[in-house]
Design a protein with these regions (language model features):
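Helix-start/capping segments and mature chain N-termini
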Residues: 1-71, 81-85, 110-164
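Short, glycine/charge-rich beta-strand/loop segments that flank catalytic centers
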Residues: 75-86, 94-109
Length: 164
């Protein structure tokens, strides 16, 4: 997997190495961020990238931001447009993509701070895994998930992913 040339920060295309978040931000320190990870599938017959269930992902992205009571929201239509711009800027062609949209508290403060909010979008080539054709083994874990009344598990919040 090669490193892309560009990422998107707050709607601006920036060089990959300049896509940074301050270490004192609440998003970095406390995981006060929400995200959607989605896939782009290259169709060689049509020479086009197809984004998998983008509308559904963006609905959940908006819901997650509202649930976290962020001071401002990045709406799905805007994030979709910025994602397409990023894909075009990187000139991705021929490979499937893993795309990550993240809204995060970019300001400093404690765990309860709700703004200001930043937006990052990254897209990286991710070829289809051999496991798709070869299969995998799985098991049921004995670990219990954190209950919804302890943390907002219905939201794709970065902090939730420390809990399995």
């Amino acid at each position: 997997m090669s490193t892309p040339k560009y990422a998107s920060i707050n709607g601006e295309i920036v060089a990959w190495e300049n896509a940074n978040v301050h270490v004192a931000s609440a998003g970095f320190k406390f995981g006060t961020a929400v995200f959607e990870g989605l896939r782009g599938y290259w169709n060689s017959d049509n020479e086009e990238m197809y984004l998998f269930r983008m509308q559904e992902h963006m609905q959940r992205f908006e819901f997650s931001q509202r649930f976290m009571r962020f001071d401002e929201l990045f709406l799905g239509d805007t994030v979709t447009q910025k994602t397409i711009e990023l894909i075009h800027a990187n000139k991705f062609k021929g490979e499937n993509l893993h795309i990550m949209t993240t809204a995060y508290v970019s300001g400093m403060g404690g765990p309860g701070v709700c703004g200001p909010i930043g937006l990052s979008i990254t897209a990286q080539e991710r070829p289809r895994s051999d496991r798709v054709l070869g299969g995998v083994t799985a098991q049921v874990s004995s670990w219990m998930r954190v209950p919804d009344n302890a943390m907002p598990m219905r939201v794709k919040c970065n902090a939730n992913y420390n809990h399995g």
